[in-house]
Amino acid sequence: MIKKKTLKIETVHECDSCLGNKTLHPLATAIDLSKADCPECSFRFGFYTVLLTEGGCEDTSYGRKYDDYSGATMIFLPPGRAILADGNKPFPPAGRLLAFHPNLILGTTLGMNIHNYTFFSYFPDEALHLSLREKAKALECIDNITGELRHAIDRHSKILISRHIELLLDYCSRFYERQFITRNERNKQILEQTDRLLDEYIRTGKPDGRLSPSAEYCSRLLHLSPQYFNDLLKFETGKKIHEYFQLKQVETAGKMLLSKENDVSLIAEKLGFPDVQHFSRLFRKITGAAPEEYRITRN
């Protein structure tokens, strides 16, 4: 198989020129892909990219599940991430491409909060799959961005374009939360896998002074991006990975305390705590009782 070249695009103007689009603003563009002239190669953009595809939602590379909508699919790319060619072209025959340079959002609320839109760090197969109503709202937001781009550039342009983009991303945050809900059964399976993974982590003594496995460690074994794993765990349990792991540690400690042969200091050591005091504080915080008190009440 011949490996397709990757075209590095550093500016919005280069992006417009490459796809046959007129540049309306040097730091942002919204392109109708049905009218674009896409070269047969992969792209690596030096700016944020949002791709809404109206066709090809069956493509398994975007990770659509049986319980997902199929009105449209959206993927989000941070600066420097490549969008790979599928077949002959990297983009579908219909859809929209929104691109905005980091310089556009400097000093804006979007610039200060861009890290909260964690889906820019998701894998392509963790894409957002829209219902028809959600698709209409996303397209409406992109049309509003396009309308502002067509306005003559003035001192209000930067803030207004940024606000329109921020509104689109806020809707996408809502839609991702909805997708977590409709993927409830799939998410339960991932949580069960996470529980088994953490139980094995504890059983094999891997903590060894490390109080918590990282999101990178767990997500790699679950074949997820670290940020998607973090967001899924937070949505389903309300906990971050280190908080969830502490619950698992205390759960395991509670079982070990049922045996009088297990000394509290030995339990703390086996579970990877630096000392008994650290273990006892956490155990009391979660259960409301000190380890020895817990042992007495349970026996």
Residue ranges, per PLM feature:
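Append "Primarily bacterial transcriptional regulators
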Residues: 72, 217-224, 229, 233, ...
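An amphipathic alpha-helical interaction segment
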Residues: 136-199
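A hydrophobic/aromatic-rich effector-binding and dimerization subdomain
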Residues: 88-153
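…primarily DNA-binding HTH/wHTH and HhH modules…
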Residues: 280-299
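A short, Lys/Arg-enriched amphipathic alpha-helix from helix-turn-helix/homeodomain DNA-binding modules
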Residues: 162, 184-222, 243-262
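Terminal helix-turn-helix DNA-binding modules in bacterial transcription factors
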Residues: 235-277, 296-299
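Conserved metal-binding segment of the jelly-roll/cupin
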Residues: 69-83, 99-102
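Generic protein-terminus/edge-of-domain signal
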Residues: 1-68
